[in-house]
């Protein structure tokens, strides 16, 4: 990725939009639809680069996936009829694809190799490999920590596992592997992490029990799977950039429709409310994956906040743009307990601080988060996404605080999760 993008957008931002389908749910819907023999339809999926890597891999395994307007039609021969791949399964920049398929392919017992791009090659996999090996998975990485991951057939066993970190990807890798075990698996979480895997298991007829921080699987649960249609809500992680953009840009009034507000993912709404931001939810739906329309209006004099504990996993992917929001508060804000940011596409603690500090903001990285001081855009230094889609979009939102254009290197990284992000932002500028 070498492209540079000059961002020249000014407020106010006004209008009504939808954001692309939720990335986490799209991945899981493709995986479960591919396992189930028959036809499943996924409506309004995210067709960014990450989810396309998941689609490509299941096509190699023998699943037919057709793109039709705003839906995917998945026709599967069933998991028992999957091909043995004769080439490396390329996961690109997708940590979700890599980690969840490490569990799923181990459970299936399909001899395979998972490998991604340079960024994925730097992201540690030991946190996934340890529990999978305790389930008797035959899986190895380079130096036992990194991709490529080499998977060979084995008989998966149930385990009683206490999570070491609040990670939905690690939890989901265990859950996908457990589908093929003759024993139940029990997972004890440290804090509540996003529960899309659990809710979507049920949607595809797979029994699973969750109570508090404990999750219990059913032996050989894969036998219950059935094809299903699934409507993917808008991704709250993508909506977050427009929420913050409207809050910090004078005169803005933006409404985002059909956003997923799963309580394990809605931390940004909680944070904005605690800061006194003008945010309203309406048109709410209930169910396993609730949705709402969200209206956001410019809010001066935002209150500082300390983000820690159980709030962190509920907003983990939004923390870079939340850090930008905190620069506009009237006092110093702190993010704690966010070590998980270190193992994202970049070390997001460092990249958030480094890039925003280049623009004149004042952030101090800590071992587990950030200290964010009230500060303003001071200089139009060239900044860099460092191939991290969320850093690229956060920097584009930061440009709204500048009176001059801002140049962002490697901006095409945003296509990982939000193709069309910049045109949508410009649409709100034009309506404003």
UniProtKB/Swiss-Prot annotation:
Compartments, as annotated in UniProt: Cytoplasm
Pathway connected to this protein: Metabolic intermediate biosynthesis; chorismate biosynthesis; chorismate from D-erythrose 4-phosphate and phosphoenolpyruvate: step 6/7
GO cellular component: cytoplasm
The UniProt record lists the keyword Cytoplasm: yes
InterPro entries to which the protein is assigned, alphabetical: Enolpyruvate_Tfrase_dom (IPR001986), Enolpyruvate_Tfrase_sf (IPR036968), EPSP_synthase (IPR006264), EPSP_synthase_CS (IPR023193), RNA3'P_cycl/enolpyr_Trfase_a/b (IPR013792)
Gene Ontology terms: biological process: amino acid biosynthetic process; aromatic amino acid family biosynthetic process; chorismate biosynthetic process
Primary location recorded for the protein, binned into one broad class: cytoplasm
Catalysed reaction equations from the record: 3-phosphoshikimate + phosphoenolpyruvate = 5-O-(1-carboxyvinyl)-3-phosphoshikimate + phosphate
Subunit annotation: Monomer.
Family that this chain belongs to: Belongs to the EPSP synthase family.
Protein name per UniProt: 3-phosphoshikimate 1-carboxyvinyltransferase
Source species of the chain: Staphylococcus aureus (strain bovine RF122 / ET3-1)
């Amino acid at each position: 990725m070498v492209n540079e993008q000059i961002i020249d957008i000014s407020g106010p931002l006004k209008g009504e939009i939808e954001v692309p389908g939720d990335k986490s749910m799209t991945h899981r819907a493709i995986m479960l639809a591919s396992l189930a023999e028959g036809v499943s339809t996924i409506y309004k999926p995210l067709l960014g680069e990450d989810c396309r890597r998941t689609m490509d891999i299941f096509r190699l395994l023998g699943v037919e996936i057709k793109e039709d307007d705003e839906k995917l039609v998945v026709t599967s021969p069933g998991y028992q009829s999957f091909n043995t791949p004769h080439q490396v399964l390329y996961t690109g920049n997708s940590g979700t694809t890599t980690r969840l398929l490490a569990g799923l392919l181990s459970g299936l017992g399909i001899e395979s190799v998972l490998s991604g791009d340079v960024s994925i090659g730097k992201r540690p996999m030991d946190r996934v490999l340890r529990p999978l090996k305790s389930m008797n998975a035959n899986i190895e990485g380079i130096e036992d920590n990194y991709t490529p991951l080499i998977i060979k057939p084995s008989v998966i066993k149930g385990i009683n596992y206490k999570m070491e970190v609040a990670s939905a990807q690690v939890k989901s890798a265990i859950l996908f592997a457990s589908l093929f075990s003759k024993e139940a698996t029990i997972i004890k979480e440290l804090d509540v992490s996003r529960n899309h895997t659990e809710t979507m298991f049920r949607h595809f007829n797979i029994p699973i029990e969750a109570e508090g921080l404990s999750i219990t699987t059913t032996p050989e649960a894969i036998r219950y799977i059935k094809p299903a249609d699934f409507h993917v809500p808008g991704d709250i992680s993508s909506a977050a950039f427009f929420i913050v953009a409207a809050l910090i840009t004078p005169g803005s009034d933006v409404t985002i429709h059909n956003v997923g507000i799963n309580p394990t993912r809605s931390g940004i709404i909680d944070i904005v409310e605690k800061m006194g931001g003008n945010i309203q939810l309406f048109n709410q739906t209930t169910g396993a994956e609730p949705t709402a329309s969200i209206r956001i209006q410019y809010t001066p004099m935002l209150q500082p906040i300390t983000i820690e504990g159980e709030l962190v996993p509920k907003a983990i992917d939004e923390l870079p743009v939340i850090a930008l929001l905190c620069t506009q508060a009237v006092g110093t804000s702190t993010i704690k307990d966010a070590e998980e940011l270190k193992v994202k596409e970049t070390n997001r603690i460092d990249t958030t601080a480094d890039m925003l500090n280049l623009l004149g903001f004042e952030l101090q990285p800590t071992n587990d988060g950030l200290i964010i001081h009230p500060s303003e855009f001071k200089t139009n230094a060239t900044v860099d996404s460092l191939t991290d889609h969320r850093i690229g979009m956060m920097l584009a939102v930061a440009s709204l605080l500048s009176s001059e254009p801002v140049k962002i290197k490697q901006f095409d990284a945003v296509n990982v999760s939000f193709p069309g992000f910049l045109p949508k932002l410009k649409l709100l500028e034009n309506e404003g």
